[in-house]
Each structure stands twice: as structure tokens, then as C-alpha cells.
Amino acid sequence: MYYNEGMGRKTQAPVSTRYPGDTLKRLDRRARVEGHSRSTLIQRYVAEGIEMDEHPGIVFRSGPAGRRPGLVSGADVWEVVAVHRSFDDVQRTADWLEQPASAIEAALRYYEAHRAVIDEWIQRNEEAAEAAERVARAQQGAS
């Protein structure tokens, strides 16, 4: 998994591959936009491509907190897992998130394969929500 810095990085070995010129131009343009090297993007694309092959229905998207896995149809995997923990029921989770049950099951399968990474996303979100709540209470008290 490359979607979050340092997660899943193992020993690296050089590999020589050839790409069409147009592909390299697009890759270099994307690397400039994202501020990464060509090599970094290739590593990310390969790792995430394998993950998507192994977990149909899962894609990776960028955001302010980094790259994260999510459902093709919307919610991030960590969001699905957090809601599922509340309901402990696939259909109720699907209804709440307005997703098909098959998408919820795909997210839960991904979670089973990458529990520590998703738990970290959930923890970070909970910490951010608690911090925002403290700020809101402090602002209310100051009024």
C-alpha cells in the first residue's frame, strides 16, 4: 500500500521497465503536479493497482490527510468501518451510508486485510473530532 507515507514499505529492488513516450510525459506531468518523483508515482500506481485488483470495488483517493482507500461509490473504507462498528450489521450500515450491501462487504474485506492502517485512520478522525469539539466548547464558554 502506498497511499499513506511509510505504510507497507518493504525492502525495495530496482526494476527496469519501458513505457510509451506519451505515458512518460503524462507521468512526469502528474509527478510535477503532485510534487513527487516519477519513481514514487510508479511505485504508488503499481501498489494501489494490485490492491484494487485484489479488492474489487476499492479505489484510492487523495485528500488533505493523504491518500486513502475508499469505495468506488463514495465513502472511505474507514468511514464504512466506523459506521459498521455502531450498527454491527451490513444491511443497516448500507442503508445508513446509502450504499449497496455488496459495497459495505467489499470495504469490510479490505479492512480485514489492512486492519491496522484503517484503525489508524479511524483513530485520527476521532482525535480530530474531539479536538474540534474542545475548540467549539471553548469558544462557547468565551462568548
Q: PLM ranges: what are they?
A:
Residues 51-77:
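Short, positively charged interaction helices/loops
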Residues 17-19, 27, 34-47:
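Short amphipathic alpha-helical segments
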Residues 27-30, 92-95:
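Short alpha-helical "recognition helix" segments of helix-turn-helix
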Residues 36-37, 95-106:
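Short, basic interhelical loop/turn and adjoining N-cap
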Residues 64-74, 122-143:
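Intrinsically disordered, low-complexity basic tails/linkers immediately adjacent to helix-turn-helix/homeobox/MYB/SANT
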Residues 55-61, 117-126:
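Short Lys/Arg-enriched helix C-cap and helix-to-coil transition segments
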Residues 73-88:
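Short, amphipathic alpha-helical "recognition" segments used to contact nucleic acids or chromatin
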Residues 1-19:
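Short Lys/Arg-rich basic patches
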